[in-house]
Amino acid sequence: MRLAVLFGGSSNEHDVSIASATSVIMNLDKEKYDITPVYLDRENRFYIWGENIESIQLLKVGDELTHLKKIDDPISFLKTFNCVFMMVHGKNGEDGILASIFDFFAIPYVGNKPVASMITMDKIYTKDILERNNISTAKYISFTKYHDEYIMKGISFSWPLFLENIKKKIHYPVFVKPANSGSSIGVIKVKQDAFLEQALIEALKIDERVLIEEAILGRELECAILENNGEVLASRVGEVLAGDEFYSFDAKYHNQESKTVIPADISLEDEEKIRKVAIQAFKTLNLHGLSRVDFFLTPDHQVILNEINTIPGFTTISMYPKLWEASGISYSELLDILIVESIKK
């Protein structure tokens, strides 16, 4: 089977995408698949890996173009493959843009469908849908920047009045989050008024839609979802022990003190509750193929859904493949299932 592994892209998760794709390629069965790595640079130009497939593990961020040859007609090129394994995180990948293009040109791909991806990429839309379906999430306030106006609950504010209004509504600590961003990029924990404005400014650099969310006191847990032969499966539950105050981008990829525990040391009752809610959320959002669902478990055993990732990380330290390995599905078997399911849809 001819398989293209697509990675890179213009999002701020570009480097994570390279690491994910490299790990995927190294774990694919080379006897089953004729693999071609396809790289998207930061301007979304397509390139083909021009060297031996095994040497991709030597790819270093910043050196990509020395190993790659430009593709002039990417659609015609990708149509020659049986499947595209999409490892483009963040913008254009998780938001359904590439999926829309692949659907239009009838190119099979690993990943969620466009509309579900677009909705789930936006934290505000996701929370609204989940709450309407009785799935608990953290309390929040959201707003949209429209030119020089700041729109909250249908009311337009100037920046000074907006800040004044927001400060009256929130109780610290809170998390300020861009609505459309992954890997915790742009997420800032704020404990007092003095730091709120700068956190909002930083979030607005990433997205014009921002949410301010209550900080939940609880353990950070994750569950992987996989669709196989028409059945939605939930993995064992893992726990994140963040090396920083929360599981930020730096804590995930740079802090050696961050750890994961699989399976999590929680009761079977709590684990089953988390797995059940993860499947419920997956189906409610009309997702297909795969996702990773992140939760908080409070001291009084409330399960609160934090976020859903439709193209979870596949790096050597990523939870998604590790959770399935702990559930009896090896990394290579997991990739096989994802590819087979993508061709069916």
Summary of predicted features, one role per range:
Residues 90, 184, 240-243, 309-323:
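Glycine-rich phosphate/pyrophosphate-binding beta-alpha loops
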Residues 1-7, 11, 19, 75-78, ...:
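Active-site nucleotide/adenylate-binding loops and adjacent lid/helix of ATP-dependent enzymes
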Residues 214, 223-225, 282-314, 324:
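Conserved metal-phosphate-binding beta-hairpin within the catalytic cores
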Residues 35, 108-109, 137, 174, ...:
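Hydrophobic beta-strand scaffold residues
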Residues 239-291, 319-345:
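Active-site "cap" helix and flanking loop/linker of ATP-utilizing ligase/carboxylase catalytic domains
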Residues 1-115, 119-125, 144-161:
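ATP-binding N-terminal substructure of ATP-dependent carboxylate-amine bond-forming enzymes
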Residues 188-276, 297, 302-304:
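Phosphate-binding site of ATP-dependent enzymes
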